[in-house]
Amino acid sequence: MAALQYLESQKNAHPELGEWYNSLADLYQKKLWHQLTLKLEQFIALSVFQAGDALIQLYNNFITDFETRINLLKLAHFAVVVSRQYPEKEAAVSYLEGVIEKLKATKESRINEPISYIETQIALFKLEQGDQKECKKILDDGKSLLDSMTDIDPSVYANFFWVSSQYHKVRQEFSEFYKNALLYLAYTSVDSLSESFKLDLAFDLSLSALLGENIYNFGELLAHPILKSLLGTNVEWLYHILQAFNHGDLVQYQELCRVHNASLSAQPALVENEKKLLEKINILCLIEIIFSRPAEDRTIPLSVIAERTKLSIEDVEHLLMKSLSVHLIEGILDQVNGTVYVSWAQPRVLGIPQIKSLRDQLDSWVDKVHTTLLSVEAETPDLVAA
């Protein structure tokens, strides 16, 4: 059989992989397709297959012999890995389109998952070719397909959100990149990612959080383990800037900008959006002021906000109107008396320092309740006894 002959020839050419080829041949002859699939997953992860056309040859000479007998989503996984070894994107797309046709020919009931997985990879190749329009079309069609399906494998979602994030990254649509990249991580084990990949993604996520419109809550990102990839690197400063934003700490932010001026200047997007960043941290400083005040003290003098943000009263009013317009807070701005009454603030993911502050407020409230109780007991003993 041609498949076995191929394995034998490869074993002779690469004796160091002899045990691998023997195992593949044994499972193939016994038609243990599930076990063969698992062994292939391990095999193609070996370093010898990470360059050249070795994977393409393995697919064409071995996997094609039984490709529709294995789990079709696993076949899609293999096909996508193989496609990345084609030096020309057009050849890779043509190969993947051929696999899709084979999937359709099986007439299996669950072919939408593997087809969606492969089409998403085609969208990425189109994006890498500079064809944003075709990439967007494939992604839109893919979303409609996913929305119509149930019980979807996490790898299909992960692949879709990853390619979507890359589309928005190319277009510098920071908020959309941020949303899709976090969704990608929701369906992906961080431990399965390489250190270099984690560092690059953590860096991109951090920048998009800072630059994205209407992103004012950094707690979710700071709590994600991928952000630890920034620590101990030459971009650790970005992690500390995120913390400063999360705490609304204008003083710390300005100090970090001074210390890491060279690194910040090397990021064109940060330089171009310097004013927006300052406005955002001032808004977050305002939010921090609101959350740090007792629940019964919802009226805040504009002078208090001006002192913390180092802004004029006029600029504070503008800051409040911006916060009201993006629905970070609800309330009434009283320009005559120079106050703002805040009736509601957008919920947020709290960090440890913010939780500690909340605990301190709760402790203070408990003390007040206890004092009130003692006062009532002392003044109306008969009523309490009754």
Swiss-Prot record:
Span of domain PCI: 174-347
Gene Ontology CC, one term: cytosol
SMART domains: PINT
Record's keyword annotation contains Acetylation: yes
Entry keyword set: Acetylation, Proteasome
Leader peptide range in chain numbering: none
Task of the protein: Acts as a regulatory subunit of the 26S proteasome which is involved in the ATP-dependent degradation of ubiquitinated proteins.
Family classification: Belongs to the proteasome subunit S11 family.
Binding partners and assembly: Component of the 19S regulatory particle (RP/PA700) lid subcomplex of the 26S proteasome. The 26S proteasome is composed of a core protease (CP), known as the 20S proteasome, capped at one or both ends by the 19S regulatory particle (RP/PA700). The RP/PA700 complex is composed of at least 17 different subunits in two subcomplexes, the base and the lid, which form the portions proximal and distal to the 20S proteolytic core, respectively.
Name by which UniProt lists this protein: 26S proteasome non-ATPase regulatory subunit 13 homolog B
